[in-house]
Amino acid sequence: MGEKLWEEYEEAKALGIETKPVLTGPYTLLKLCRYTGSKTAEDFTDAVIAAYQQVFEKCAAHRIMWLQLDEPALVRDLSKEDIALFHKIYENVLPCKKTVRILLQTYFGDVRDIYKDLTELPFDGIGLDFIEGKETVHLIEKYGFPKDKLLFAGLVNGKNIWRNHYDRTLNQLQQLTGKGIQTVLSTSCSLLHVPYTVKHETKLSEKYLDYFAFAEEKLSELKELSGFAENPSYTQESVYKKNCALFTEDRDCENAAVKKRLSEVTEKDYVRLPKRSERQQLQKETFHLPQFPTTTIGSFPQTKDVKQNRAAFRKGEITEQEYTCLLYTSD
């Protein structure tokens, strides 16, 4: 077992930063592995359990407060065997957590097949996706959420590039806290799916940039939303009003011509014309292809000379005729 996780944790701690290490969860790890021959996930379960037990023990030794285990495989359709495998893993590893608090994080969907099982196991926190998890709200309403656990509510979209609708998110947040659920506001998934920051978008008009939220901006949104959640008079805040205006005022970034064309689409437009037999004949007459045309599956490797010649041609340093001749003579 490597030392990277604990070395980086201690490095951050020395700088006064308390981090939350994140690992792929054991269930998802087993489900994502490729097995050969007659081997299955069950053949490696005991070894994986032993490895994560060691991880928990080392986290406790380093006095890590929170350890996040990502289990996105739980949003798939789960069989009884899948659920049994999940139980076997966590019933063996969770007793080793000692003082470490374990966050089970899910994303890219809801956990309808295993929600009750998750809430009954001794996790300290459970992360749920409220964006792509279409059944997440219904599951909480139907089965409730344990008062002794933290709900990491993925209410800010971690995959798209758009601003969060503060009013809508705060209403969802209030519904959760109104049920007595201890809630931590979070993104629906990791922010690795979006660009780093809007600050570097120097060629876009400010009126368009106002609608964008990349990774840094989404972190700012979380901070602002958290502040509003604790402020009874947040509706009077200028930041809140500015956000509301984004969703109440008409956007001039819409292309009227495209919108008009879309509104005129009919069922007939989904039928390709002319019919296939006529297209096939036209293609034969136009392209004169052999019976079995052969091509490559990609471009040919480019040598250093080819790249230099292309650059020279683009800069106007050589003519098209010279460039063509070089293509035929280059090694």
Task: Give the residues covered by each predicted segment.
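Active-site-proximal loop/short-helix segments
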Residues: 22-37, 63-86, 191-201, 306-307
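Alpha-helix-loop-beta-strand connector modules within alpha/beta enzyme cores
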Residues: 83-100, 222
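Catalytic-face loop-and-helix region of soluble metabolic enzyme cores
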Residues: 117-213, 224, 228
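Conserved, mostly hydrophobic/aromatic
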Residues: 12, 59, 71, 118, ...
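N-terminal small/glycine-rich loop or linker at the start of catalytic domains
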Residues: 15-42, 191, 285-324
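Conserved small/polar residues in nucleotide/adenosyl-binding loops
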Residues: 328-331
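Flexible inter-domain linker/hinge segments
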Residues: 1, 210-295, 302-305
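Hydrophobic faces of well-ordered beta-strands that scaffold small-molecule active sites
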Residues: 19-23, 67-69, 102-106, 126-128, ...
